[in-house]
Amino acid sequence: MTRQQFLRLLTSGSVSAIAGPFAYPQRAAASDRGSHGAPTNDQPLPTNDQRPTTDDQRPAGFPAGVTKAVTAFIQHSRLDDIPDKALVEAKRCLIDGFGVVLAGATVHGSAIVREYVKTFDVATRGASILGPERLSANAGHAALANAASGHAMDYDDTQLSSTPDRVFGLLTHPTVPVLAASLAIGERLGVSGRKFLEAFLTGFEVECKIAEAIKPDHYLRGFHSTGTMGTFGGAASAAKLLALTPTAIPHALGIAASMSSGIRVNFGSMTKPLHAGRAAENGITAAELASRGFTAGDDALDGEWGFFQVLGGGVDLPRIMTTLGRPYSIVDPGVSFKPYPCGSLGHPTMDAMLKLVTDHDVKPDQVAHVAVRAGSNILNPLRYKTAKTELEAKFCLPFMMSSILLRRRAGIREFTDEFVASAPVQAMMANVETVFDKDIEARGFDKMRSVVVVQLKDGRTLTQPSDERYRGGPENPFTRADLHAKFTDCASLVLSADRIKRALDAIESVEKLANIRELVSALTA
């Protein structure tokens, strides 16, 4: 096209002719489109002349009502109607969640967030920030700080997928954003333990079902689902505690949809846990604004411009429309609890190395070379070939292997900047290689599969495949004793032994508390 032709087209108003096949479809006016609906994953967006003019003319693939279904669930959920098994599992998640919040509050990134929160001089400081010092803030900032702490060590629980077609069979870290939002609003209002538990389970279920329903492309595009899905969980739990009306709840969801974010490029930095913090804070902001009459689209999860389509390329309706609370995701398929404070994709490999080292009594000075063979579902997210900081170490297989070889453990006292940067660790990491294995890749992404191969200086080669029934997962779950031990280890960085016992007692009897502030008191240093 010549410059003269371009100018003639521009002055004639035919801009779409210039863009040709690369033009973005223009949004139809409200009167020219249906009020809900997203295309299926395989269906392209309709052109302007194909778009429906009324709901009755909506084409197949543009279903209505996901936002309405979520709204109805939030409005009508009641603790009395929730199965006992869900209540038991909720308490297990709370034990794990509060433990990792307390431990995570001791790391440098969490301290920076608290210093940021301190700069706000607000009249109402009705919510506590857990950690090594007594602090309070408004609900949003308290939730920001607590949730950022809860994800700071990458030690928080993981939602399991109900089907093996989702990448890794894992979806998001569900507890921390919802816990932080529920605690902040609950403490400010002085609600009972039952109301707190009701809100926690409501937000947890909304977050998990949205994570189930969105297409896997959401995560593959680079979104961090803890930040994106957690925003809806925080909004749902806050909406429940604030008793939002059926009119206000969709607006809260719409605001949350526009505030939902988090990208995977920030894995291995302080910003990854900030995603969880912002999810909790933004969820509260969405509910608080909606409670005051602030508006948003009332179909934000639906439609060609709705959350599912824009951020994930579509929605699997059966995973959400008829499954909210049927069963509760916290029960089936459940969650996995982490035995190590790092990316869960490395845990089966770490257990394999631990078994190899203990079975053969391998000493660090015997090791000549280590190879970890795995598929891209493990090697791509655990992207660091070597680590200089504890944040990088959480996504670095060579560090994970080195820690177990050197200390036969990899806990919160190993994931420190000092240990990661130490000469023995750096030297051992130089001997660890990650290898893409096409045979493992061909078996699919539904499991976390790997093989550890250790060559010793005496010429022996030791091999250990990972166990797909990984510790903390559905086939090898944490016991009550395991959870108590993890909580004690985490909380001991902040609380005395007496307070740790008091906190555990309060969590396990949370539904009996007249005021959730009793639990906050038990968790406060």
Report residues per predicted region.
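Short, well-ordered loop/turn and helix-capping segments at boundaries between secondary-structure elements
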Residues: 12, 276, 285-296, 313, ...
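Flexible, glycine/charged-enriched surface loops at secondary-structure junctions
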Residues: 84-85, 108-110, 294-302, 359-370, ...
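Twin-arginine (Tat) signal peptide motif
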Residues: 1-7
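Intrinsically disordered, low-complexity Ser/Thr/Pro/Gly-rich interaction regions
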Residues: 343-497
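A short, charged
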Residues: 485-517
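Intrinsic disorder/low-complexity segments
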Residues: 29-57
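Membrane-embedded hairpin module used as a gating/binding unit in multi-pass transport
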Residues: 314-358
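N-terminal core-entry segment
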Residues: 9-27, 31, 55-333, 378, ...
